[in-house]
Curated annotation (Swiss-Prot):
Its main location: cytoplasm. It comes from Salmonella typhi. Substrate binds at R77, L115, E156. This is Chorismate pyruvate-lyase. GO terms for molecular function: chorismate lyase activity. It is found in: Cytoplasm. GO terms for cellular component: cytosol. The keyword Cytoplasm applies. It is an enzyme of class 4 (lyase). One of its GO terms (biological process) is ubiquinone biosynthetic process. The gene is ubiC.
Length: 165
């Protein structure tokens, strides 16, 4: 199963440098903290619609080439993050199999728990970069994060109903 928002997410084109944008847009796109938490601060009940969660081969995560270690298997999680039931964000997380050892194994078992609830409670979380992307009228971003030094790639597309717009 897929979702049209995930097709748009995969079509994001990334800027080489941070573009000159309105402060409101940059505030969302360069957010270092949890998007889940920011959505909750809007007074909304945040929930996850799980689209896909499975091990996949390299061919299904080509966008991670050069950004993550080359491995034969990756854990892929695709979701819609909803606020009061309305989709505000499409998310795609790519995790190399080698990252899934020790406490990071929990990444395979998040189910309908927002990724941010796990990531931003970890004292071992670091972020290597945030890249801003765009597809038509929608904005997104991708980040390489590390848990205990082990990488994962998170891509987020802000959907039309989100407060970014």
């Amino acid at each position: 199963m897929s979702h049209p928002a995930l097709t748009q997410l995969r079509a994001l084109r990334y800027f080489d440098a941070i573009p000159a944008l309105e402060p409101h847009l940059l505030d969302w796109l360069l957010l270092e903290d949890s998007v889940t938490k920011r959505f909750e601060q809007q007074g909304k009940r945040v929930s996850v619609t799980l689209i896909r969660e499975a091990f996949v081969g390299q061919s299904e995560v080509e966008e991670a080439s050069g950004l993550l270690p080359s491995e034969s298997r990756y854990w892929l999680r695709e979701i819609l993050l909803c606020a009061d039931g309305e989709p505000w964000l499409a998310g795609r997380t790519v995790v190399p199999e080698s990252t899934l050892c020790g406490p990071e194994q929990v990444l395979q078992h998040l189910g309908k728990t927002p990724l941010g609830r796990y990531l931003f409670t970890s004292s071992t979380l670091t972020r290597d970069f945030i890249e801003i992307g765009r597809d038509a009228t929608l904005w997104g971003r991708r980040s390489r994060l590390r848990l205990s030094g082990k990488p994962l790639l998170l891509t987020e597309l802000f959907l039309p109903a989100s407060p970014l717009y």
